[in-house]
């Protein structure tokens, strides 16, 4: 016979929840259980900053009165007096409560409160004999009853999924998690300000697309009932942003979400944040210089330095980023190869097969030399690109939206930026020849028909926009989540997304 009774830990939690619900019932009977008439006038961090260095006598003489509120994280009842620690959005402050000041009824009520409850305190700022800044409570109120007990310990691999699934608990319990998302906000704020200072206009483009475009990726598909048409969550905003360049906005950018119905890994989440920007009369060389500036300023704003530490290794964004062609990178990081070998498509295909690549699959079966070289780069060199490195001169066949080189047949004016072995940004001089773009779209459709799920669709309206004339333009996309991973020393993309996607909970 199978025993479906709860585990001991679950039984304890259920008992505690039942006890707290009983307390809530008494609060309801007594009046308003969740009052909303208290407004704090001070935060913990501000109190520490303003009064942390003052001594007992100075604070006593000043008679500073404050109103604070937050979650009770610690509670020590010692007869007629008690201490509690309240955590607000800025930090923690100790509260001293005594029966003589509060009165018998209020003090008895406080003793019934639980860790996790949201409480409000009015009182005076003072220092204990041990020198800890505190608030001596003149009044204490319960604002919000916590029905679930907070975990005693909230760290380690065993709790990792719980952190992602119940981020609200993680944020309550883990200072480092809160700092991660504060750092993220600083980085995004810096990027936005740098773009505005450079004369870019921030815009919003559609999230629902009639045709997915702007990247090689598998989209999420949905249906618009009123219009009775299939639609796609956007995989990239690129084609809409370039329509705006056609329309006369010479510098535009967007910070928003993209969606790709692909795998989940420490570097991939189906929903992720990108910053894409486009500048008329700019080429890929200007883009590389400007992207360096954007990332360097984001690092300084978020961490105070352009020299980072990631996974115990230095990552220096203060120096000019390296620039290598695909073949130069292979020869540098896999020096057993020669340029002659890399120029031999049959040799490269054979090497890829040795390395386990699916050379007969829909992507590589039809690949030319450039695409094969790129695949070999991904197998041999990409993971070794620790310091910021631009890989340049991508082949036309894997760059359907990039401008072709005027001097090197088959090569585009495109780059990808790598740090710590990960792609951080992708940019290029934009293809603004409508006839060339139409031909490349047709080649993408053929690839899709041959089984390449990530190949692009033919976007006739985008071709029509180009036919009105788009000025010479450069554009780039920066992966915000991966950048924040570096800025916060986070090993997984889930660590820097507030609510990452997970399998359904059992």
Curated annotation (Swiss-Prot):
Mg(2+) 2 binds at residue 423. Its cofactor is Mg(2+). SUPFAM superfamilies: Class II aaRS and biotin synthetases (SSF55681), Nucleic acid-binding proteins (SSF50249). Disulfide bonds: none annotated. It is found in: Cytoplasm. The keyword Protein biosynthesis applies. Its main location: cytoplasm. GO terms for cellular component: cytosol. Its EC number is 6.1.1.6. Gene3D superfamilies: Bira Bifunctional Protein, Domain 2, Nucleic acid-binding proteins. Keywords: Aminoacyl-tRNA synthetase, ATP-binding, Cytoplasm, Ligase, Magnesium, Metal-binding, Nucleotide-binding, Protein biosynthesis. GO terms for biological process: lysyl-tRNA aminoacylation. It is an enzyme of class 6 (ligase). It catalyses: tRNA(Lys) + L-lysine + ATP = L-lysyl-tRNA(Lys) + AMP + diphosphate. Mg(2+) 1 binds at residues 416, 423. Binds 3 Mg(2+) ions per subunit. GO terms for molecular function: ATP binding; lysine-tRNA ligase activity; magnesium ion binding; tRNA binding. Homodimer. Belongs to the class-II aminoacyl-tRNA synthetase family. NCBIfam families: lysS_bact, PRK00484.1. This is Lysine--tRNA ligase. It comes from Bordetella petrii (strain ATCC BAA-461 / DSM 12804 / CCUG 43448). The gene is lysS.
